[in-house]
Amino acid sequence: PTLHSARLAISGSGGIGIADSCGLQFVQEVFAEKNCAEKLNPGTDAVIELGGEDAKILFFGRHFDARMNDSCAGGTGAFIDQMASLLNVETPQMNELAQQAQNTYTIASRCGVFAKSDIQPLLNQGAEKSDLAASIFHAVASQAITGLAKGRPISGNVLYLGGPLTFMSCLCDAFDSVLNIKGVCPENSLLYVAMGAAFCAEHEVDLTTLPEKLQAAAAQHSFEHLPPLFKNEDEYTVFKKRHSKESVAIGTPEEASEAFIGIDSGSTTIKIAVMSPDGKLLDSFYQSNKGNPVVAVRNYLTDFYTKYPHCRLLAGAVTGYGEDLIRHGFGVDYGIVETMAHFYAAQYLEPEVDFILDIGGQDMKCLKIHNGAIDNIFLNEACSSGCGSFLQTFAEILGYTAEQFAQIGLKADMPVDLGSRCTVFMNSSVKQAQKDGASVANISAGLSISIVKNALYKVIRPASKEAIGKHIVVQGGTFLNDCVLRAFEQEMDLNVIRPNIAGLMGAYGAALYAQRRYKDAPHQTTLLNLQQLGEFVHTVKGMTCGLCNNHCHLTVNTFAGGKRFISGNRCERPITHMAPKDELNLYRQKLQLLKELPVNETPKRGIMGIPMGLNMYELLPFWNALLSSLGFKVVHSPIEDKTIYRLGQGTIPSDTVCYPAKLMHGHIKWLLQQGITNIFYPCMTYNIDEQGTENCYNCPVVAYYPEVLHANIRDLNKPEINFFYDYLGLLHKKKLVKKLQEMFAKAYPDITKDEIRKAVDAAFTAFYDYEAQVKAKGQEIISKAREEHKPIVVLAGRPYHIDPKVNHSIDRLITNMGAALVSEDAVSSHIKTKELNRDLQVLNQWTYHGRLYAAAEYVAQNPDMHLIQLVSFGCGCDAITADECRRLLEERGRIYTQIKIDDIDNLGAAKIRIRSLFSAAQLFDIDNN
């Protein structure tokens, strides 16, 4: 029988507008889901639900609590869809792949585009897709737990709801593994919100008239829009004509007997340029690498040799994310960092170029040129929402190729104002615009404008339009999109140069570089020939290195003849089987000093545990001496144990706090697991006064994180645990003695004031000895580097940035490139702080900040030194220090380099930044000499 009426209610993120327009009952989705779970699954303790763009955890019990994602759609169904697209598989295949996994990698899940920055280098290095699929599921589970549970334990009877958890058993397994539980995905798990809404429905609705009401509601919407990119067809014709003037001469391989080849193995695409000795582009290749750049390069070279046997390739160069893999696999003569490749190409086309903007698949490079040399480099730090993959993702979602999507956007009459949000969350804005009646053309144009705003206001951040330059070259595949190019010119109100080979400039620059190097030293090319390509073999195997405590996940690529390329290593040990040489690395020498601190082996008062993180990387010598003097044996948590983070993951209350702070939860958990009942980690508003700064504050996280740990790690509140987290200061000895006596009074009333006074004296002596050793070792490294004519890098950060878990061995990456390395505290004392304060544009009131400013000033005064600042994601304070350090360096004509770090240990982007700095500095020196 036909159903004419029913009790009906609507729920879900898109339901409230429909309910209002049609006069229907709306039930909030959390309430609907809670209602259904209580009716169908009594005794449920928690619900974890992943949807398309939302994620939620519901806690049942005496106090019901709901946690939902608010500003980021990372770690949801849309995130998994995007990762499947990146792996070039259908979403359902992700589960099949994950079932075959042998290893897992650390992948970011806070942002879909940022995750590409972790996955794409692994793909380019030959990592197995099955391992990556499993890693993505683990990342989603970690994101949900740390981002939503915020430290609240998840245990007991747990339901898994929503599409991703329903259709992907390996995702459920990942949650089970991280939470150490066995959750249940119930029958009708997709329908709990709908069934809950039905249980709540109170009013009968006439179903025969409902379709008309829904259609009427759909026609009422409108959307915010911007002016069109082109007013009419004539304006577009003039635009095309202007940009057709800037071009590289085009030839054919038939007309040349010799050529140079450049390969750009990018994040998502492979670009190849074959160039004649007089600069003509003879042949080119541009396509998606489909997660396997090796196959694409082999096919191209085989095809070229077969078609043009008369055209001899004299030399080749490779650049991009896959540079090392392609160079090893195909015997390419030279490698060049991609920033320099793009610079060579732009300078060849426009000798007076003073600014280059390259937007690729997931990275953005901005090069400031002065007097024919690179003066400064900007790269997108983490987010790729202003890049080509951003547009490509949406084109595919809407059912178009990137080229079709761009053409459609040219005809937009009302581009949607989408702002500049992150990729995964932009899904919501695009879907809302569609509901509001926006055409695909207006969405395409709106997204192009968003890309430009991201580039300008989140990466370049110019003080004015004039500051960018007068001779601007834009390149990269994204600028082949006329919508993006037009949006950039409109936003900046100036005309720019887009070469006819904008998408090939990296490859063309690599070919120019190969030609330059070949002219300097002619030789027989090492490129594989046609016969060798016919015998070409490439196998990939994942393994975990056991040669040190890093336990790096290695990807071993084996080629014909047994030649191997290993990636994923953070030192040379897997290749050389020798321990890294750290005599010119102050980071490692500081760690060694901390490891060699004396231990009280005859403690009269037992063991005192110290969590080895944050300010303990500076103050351990102080507290070790003090506590040892008081009769304790000091045991600190491990320095190089990568499992520490997961130990405390479930107790982290905020996903936005910096990674070094998150690690503290694991350090405390480790100490508790060892049965240690005394844990010492005091709150410290102030640091040691280093004289000259306006004050000597610690940052709020360093100062007060013990409070966060006490509030979120329940075991610290057990009666048998003594957690010493009182507020202490090192500015006044007498006050410190008094506070320590008060702190220990309850647990150790026998500790006398005289004992504490002697212990404090011993602590200050030990600390100043350690400080002197650091400065002396730093000076030794600087002197030796100058004797050996090595570049000197001041890797400037905070004390805890020497932690290998935090810096991911970036220090060794730098020294492996041939540089000497010191930390900011080794050089900061050379600067008179009071004089520096007069030049600063910020209040110098934080101890760590003061060292950074002084180090930047010292580097600016020493031409053989370069500063690289390490910044942890989530560090609000370093938003200030980064700008001020940049200013101090750039006003002296020096290059500022920043590397942002968190829990992700793939160093592909960091390597590009460091090589770019060294290459630019070398060019600058040559130019000035």
Language-model segment annotations:
Residues 1-31, 58-67, 277, 289, ...:
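Short beta-strand-loop/turn "lid" adjacent to the catalytic site in phosphate-handling enzymes
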Residues 14, 148-178, 189-193, 319-322, ...:
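Glycine-rich phosphate-binding loops at beta-strand->alpha-helix junctions
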Residues 26-30, 176-195, 333-340, 489-508, ...:
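Conserved phosphate-binding/catalytic loops in two-lobed NTP-binding clefts
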Residues 44-61, 250-282, 353-370, 544-548, ...:
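Gly/Thr-rich phosphate-binding beta-strand-loop-beta motif of the actin/hexokinase/Hsp70
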Residues 62-103, 190-193, 199-203, 284-294, ...:
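Glycine-rich phosphate-binding loop plus the immediately following alpha-helix
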Residues 69, 73-80, 383-391, 398, ...:
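An N-terminal assembly and electron-transfer interface module characteristic of large anaerobic redox
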Residues 80-82, 187-221, 344, 388-393, ...:
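Glycine-rich phosphate-binding/hydrolytic loop that grips phosphoryl groups
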Residues 132-156, 197, 240-249, 446-469, ...:
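Phosphate/ATP-binding catalytic cores across multiple sugar-kinase/actin-like superfamilies
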